[in-house]
């Protein structure tokens, strides 16, 4: 398992939004590049970078910052937020990203997705942004039925997804263990867990689920790391323990 720090960018700043709503910005930091370097220095093995301005407003003014982060760190960077067509995904891949996170594009027809995944499957990871049995798209401003997405993922033979609990994201309310266990029980995907991870206790709970299933690839943490609610070294020790 890995711990991946999350860096969300809105109007060139690092932000944290409660449940993805821009009117609920909780934290702001001026320099995303410095934060990315900081996490690499702390020992992060990868970074999770989301362009919230592109996801929510459809504005791509953070491209230069994203490219600079990729240039200035030596660890893998996954990017997401507004990657809703093949051209934009290819552009990010050409920057040298580890992988592109997609969700809204999964609404497109199966032929389009088959072509995309056959060409870039190792460079794409679907994000299942979960809210009460539905999946958030378009910056979590719209929702679609999970079944519609699942059928396509199965046909595309997707094996790994990010599972984000929207109701917990940015809230520091802790993880919903039952949501995670239910999702794992009903589906065959390996998952990365995001949304609501707020304490060392949450890390321990996730590690215990991993011991039961061995299907959790890692955790993606934003606000709790930024606010110091989770100590990086302690969390790493728990994740890496046998």
Swiss-Prot record:
It is found in: Cytoplasm. GO terms for biological process: L-histidine biosynthetic process. Gene3D superfamilies: Aldolase class I. Pathway: Amino-acid biosynthesis; L-histidine biosynthesis; L-histidine from 5-phospho-alpha-D-ribose 1-diphosphate: step 4/9. GO terms for molecular function: 1-(5-phosphoribosyl)-5-[(5-phosphoribosylamino)methylideneamino]imidazole-4-carboxamide isomerase activity. Keywords: Amino-acid biosynthesis, Cytoplasm, Histidine biosynthesis, Isomerase. Its EC number is 5.3.1.16. PANTHER family: 1-(5-PHOSPHORIBOSYL)-5-[(5-PHOSPHORIBOSYLAMINO)METHYLIDENEAMINO] IMIDAZOLE-4-CARBOXAMIDE ISOMERASE (PTHR43090:SF2). Belongs to the HisA/HisF family. HAMAP family: HisA. This is 1-(5-phosphoribosyl)-5-[(5-phosphoribosylamino)methylideneamino] imidazole-4-carboxamide isomerase. It comes from Dictyoglomus turgidum (strain DSM 6724 / Z-1310). The gene is hisA.
């Amino acid at each position: 398992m890995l711990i991946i720090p999350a860096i969300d960018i809105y109007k060139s700043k690092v932000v944290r939004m409660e449940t993805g709503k821009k009117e609920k910005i909780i934290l702001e930091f001026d320099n995303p590049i410095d934060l990315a370097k900081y996490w690499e220095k702390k020992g992060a093995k990868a970074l999770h970078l989301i362009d919230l301005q592109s996801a929510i407003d459809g504005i791509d003014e953070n491209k230069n910052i994203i490219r600079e982060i990729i240039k200035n760190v030596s660890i893998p960077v996954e990017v997401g937020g507004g990657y809703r067509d093949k051209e934009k995904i290819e552009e990010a891949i050409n920057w040298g990203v580890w992988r592109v996170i997609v969700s809204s594009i999964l609404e497109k027809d199966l032929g389009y997705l088959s072509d995309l995944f056959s060409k870039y499957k190792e460079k794409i990871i679907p994000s299942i942004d979960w809210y009460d049995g539905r999946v958030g798209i378009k910056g979590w401003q719209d929702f679609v039925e999970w079944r519609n997405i699942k059928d396509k993922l199965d046909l595309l033979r997707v094996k790994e997804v990010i599972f984000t609990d929207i109701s917990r994201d940015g809230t520091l309310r802790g993880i919903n263990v039952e949501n995670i266990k239910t999702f794992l029980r009903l589906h065959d995907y390996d998952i990365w867990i995001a949304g609501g991870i707020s304490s060392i206790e949450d890390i321990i709970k996730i590690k215990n689920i991993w011991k039961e299933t061995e299907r959790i690839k890692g955790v993606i943490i934003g606000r709790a790391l930024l606010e110091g609610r989770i100590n990086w070294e302690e969390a790493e020790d728990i994740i890496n323990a046998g």
